């Protein structure tokens, strides 16, 4: 079966002032698959993830070379509208960050602003659909007017996922989305990731090796700003080609 790539980084380097945080990264992310980015703290994986929707544009004295393509679109083309780009590439952060609004408005706010919904009926349908996809609807359907911040940590994170997918992105980026959650909530997030890949291409940063092996199709190992190895998750975890990869996933360093 031919693999279609949704997003591709080509010879990408990234600098904080004079410090080179990422060194000549080339990687392709298959469509409707989950790719896990692993590596020790400070290896560049979260910096790389933020490059994929230009979040690092907000950081002073940074620069990037190379290309990142979303389909035929070079996302660093100066003519690109970054707000429009981030509609195509959603982001879920490590710490749940619901808006201080109702559960309903957490989902409806951005689609209203961007004109994705025009009537109350359309908005209701989008809110319900997004909460269903995030596995949260049955838990909150009778209290949509409650504050999103009143939910449990795991529910807040699924609300943030629902908020991201309400914008109907092509790609969903997740930066350690379960690291602040208990094991039960973590399992729900992992199950959700496997369900969501039917509709979205997912790129997830994780420090949890078991999570990477359970919830991803492909794995990329970063070390000191370099992409050391990339391949199917089964191969990376059972027969890694590089000794550094093997040492990391077996706990010898990192």
Curated annotation (Swiss-Prot):
User: Which reactions appear under catalytic activity for this entry?
Assistant: phosphate(out) + ATP + H2O = ADP + 2 phosphate(in) + H(+)
What is the membrane topology here? Peripheral membrane protein
What domain of life is recorded for the organism?
A: Bacteria
Instruction: Identify the keywords attached in UniProt to this record, alphabetized.
Output: ATP-binding, Cell inner membrane, Cell membrane, Membrane, Nucleotide-binding, Phosphate transport, Translocase, Transport
Q: What class of enzyme is it?
A: translocase
An example GO biological process term is: phosphate ion transmembrane transport
EC number(s) given by UniProt = 7.3.2.1
Principal localisation = membrane
Q: Which residues cross the membrane?
A: none
- UniProt: ATP binding residues: 39-46
Cellular localization per UniProt: Cell inner membrane
Q: Which residues form the ABC transporter domain?
A: 7-249
Asked whether the UniProt record includes Iron-sulfur among its keywords, one would answer no
Q: Per UniProt, what is one GO molecular function of this protein? A: ATP hydrolysis activity
The record's Gene Ontology cellular component field reads:
plasma membrane
Family label = Belongs to the ABC transporter superfamily. Phosphate importer (TC 3.A.1.7) family.
Relate the protein's function as given in its record: Part of the ABC transporter complex PstSACB involved in phosphate import. Responsible for energy coupling to the transport system.
Assembly, per entry: The complex is composed of two ATP-binding proteins (PstB), two transmembrane proteins (PstC and PstA) and a solute-binding protein (PstS).
- Protein name in UniProt: Phosphate import ATP-binding protein PstB
* Organism, as annotated: Chlorobium chlorochromatii (strain CaD3)
């Amino acid at each position: 079966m031919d693999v279609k790539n949704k997003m591709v980084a080509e010879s990408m380097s990234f600098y904080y002032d004079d410090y080179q945080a990422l060194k000549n990264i080339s990687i392709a992310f298959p469509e409707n698959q989950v790719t896990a980015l692993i590596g020790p703290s400070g290896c560049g994986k979260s910096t790389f993830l933020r490059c994929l929707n230009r979040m690092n544009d907000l950081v002073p004295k940074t620069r990037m070379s190379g290309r990142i393509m979303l389909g035929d679109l070079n996302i660093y083309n100066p003519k690109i509208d970054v707000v429009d780009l981030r509609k195509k590439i959603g982001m879920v952060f490590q710490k749940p960050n619901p808006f201080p609004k109702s559960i309903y408005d957490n989902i409806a706010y951005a689609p209203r602003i961007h004109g994705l919904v025009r009537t109350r009926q359309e908005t209701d349908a989008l809110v319900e659909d997004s909460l269903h996809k995030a596995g949260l609807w049955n838990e909150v359907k009778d209290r949509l007017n409650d504050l999103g911040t009143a939910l449990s940590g795991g529910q807040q994170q699924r609300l943030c996922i629902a908020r991201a997918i309400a914008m109907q992105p092509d790609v969903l980026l997740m930066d350690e989305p379960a690291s602040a959650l208990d094991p039960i909530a973590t399992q729900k997030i992992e199950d959700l990731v496997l369900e969501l890949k039917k509709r979205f291409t997912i790129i997830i940063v994780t420090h949890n090796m078991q999570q990477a092996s359970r919830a991803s199709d492909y794995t990329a190992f970063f070390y000191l700003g370099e992409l050391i190895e990339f391949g199917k998750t089964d191969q990376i975890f059972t027969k890694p080609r590089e000794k550094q990869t093997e040492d990391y996933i077996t706990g010898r360093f990192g």
